[in-house]
Amino acid sequence: MSRSWISKRESKILYILLTTTELYLKTGHPVGSKTLKEYEGSNLSTATIRNYFSELEAEGFLKKNHISGGRIPTDLAFRYYVDHCADCSQDELPESTINLLNQLPEESQNIVKDLQKASELLGEALQLPTCFSSPRFDNDSVTNIQLSLVDEQRAVVILSTEFGQIFTDTLWLSEASNPASLKRIEIFLQSYVRKQSPMEILSQKEEDIGMTLYNEVVVRYLTRYCNFSEEDLYQTGLSKLLRYESFKDPDMLALGLSFFENRRHMCKLLDIGMHRDRPTAFIGNELSDIFRTPNPQCAVITIPYYMNRTPLGAFGVLGPVNLPYKEIFKTLTIFADKIKASLTQSFYKFKLSFRRPCPSDPTLSKEPTLLARYSSIKLLPPKETS
């Protein structure tokens, strides 16, 4: 059936394939010849439909359910369905989906935070785990710093930036500290990053600890901010897989979760999706072929998002192979159009710029004075730390 032309009989068989796949996606149950005849309302006999089923089974498009005797589409059938039907939906999206898409962020300078919110809304609309890739946006600045004591000599430092990024590090304290002392240091550093007068008077020891923590975490931040070999990846909504019947099996759930949490896999799929101007589905065995791994028994659908005509990254959703592809493709297309409009306005209004990963860039270095060229974040000068 791979020829450029097909006979009338082959056309009928492929119609049966598409109809069987459509019915399976709607019901989630194996499709029998009688059920299909009632659904499509044709004058084909059940015996003829069973013969077509047998041919499609031999071609690898269907497999038989040994309990009911009905047929279940294979990954190959879902691929054929996606290629021929997924972009053809005339159905209106559910009102709940439209309402969520209308909540997408408007223009703002908090690019990363807005993209994260958009990802959450997309996940709610589709009830699927979502992820997205993002370049690095230039001239970001630290707007908040928080400290949390792990024990007497370790603290978690959290940096928040103007563009909505959050960085965390666990750092060793040069001297033992307590929660009250660390809180005073936190308030002092928050005043510093906000260019306000200090609200706390610190002892010399506390000031030394604070400046050491700040400079250490800023150097780490600048290093990560400027030296990166792949787009940033954000993921959310893994628990949504539990609502799907196929993922109630612990082994299937483990396969899906391990695939979604594999950063290398998701970055590669989003990179492929970013360079296509439409939704792209990767289904079951196709994922296995790309990564030379066992079949993860799931599907990933990606769509690029743009600033004007420039692709910035891609959003992706993950779910079982029997996804409602038509609804997802339509939702993703509307979603991407709204994101494009918002990002384009934001970039021009706030004069934003961004960088792609470039591991071979000779200007990238761990030397703080070179790193700082890409950001407005600065180290404290020596006189302020003495």
Swiss-Prot record:
Pfam families: HrcA. InterPro entries: GAF-like_dom_sf, HrcA, HrcA_C, WH-like_DNA-bd_sf, WH_DNA-bd_sf. Signal peptide: none annotated. One of its GO terms (molecular function) is DNA binding. Keywords: Repressor, Stress response, Transcription, Transcription regulation. One of its GO terms (biological process) is negative regulation of DNA-templated transcription. It comes from the Bacteria. The keyword Transcription regulation applies. Belongs to the HrcA family. Negative regulator of class I heat shock genes (grpE-dnaK-dnaJ and groELS operons). Prevents heat-shock induction of these operons. This is Heat-inducible transcription repressor HrcA. It comes from Chlamydia caviae (strain ATCC VR-813 / DSM 19441 / 03DC25 / GPIC) (Chlamydophila caviae).
